[in-house]
């Protein structure tokens, strides 16, 4: 593990990669609404949502946040062979721009910190969810991950 830790520490401050584009369909939004019991009209009622400044339905902020996990796994990161990785939490989560239905998003990941903890390592990563064709990101968060060996 020490070799992996040193290799990752050398990458601190670097962007590690970008995920593929993910389409945010109304079906995905509706499924998230069902799973979380969050049926606010701006997410699930296209007719009412069309009358808002958004001009249509938008993804839940927490859907965008939830998708950051599988998107991050698309970005190659050589962490050796941990027994498991766990979500340790988040810091400074913001949703600067809404994600309109049928738009595409992707994740950009930067490694901010790496440190040793008992049995493993702790990483702090900045994750930025971009919306295709827009400058303002959908989400910016500091993601905390623990790997145990």
Please identify what each model-predicted range represents.
Residues 17, 21-23, 94, 144-146:
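Generic structural detector for well-ordered beta-strands
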Residues 52-56, 69-108:
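Hydrophobic beta-strand-centered segment that forms part of the acyl-chain substrate-binding groove
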Residues 18-20, 28, 38, 82-91, ...:
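A generic structural signal for short beta-strands and their flanking turns/coil linkers
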Residues 2-11, 99-149:
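HotDog/MaoC-like acyl-thioester-processing domains
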Residues 60-64, 68:
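A solvent-exposed, acidic/Ser-Thr-rich amphipathic alpha-helical stretch
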Residues 1-59:
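Catalytic strand-loop segment that frames the active site of acyl-thioester-processing enzymes
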Residues 18, 66, 107-109:
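A generic structural signal for residues embedded in beta-strands
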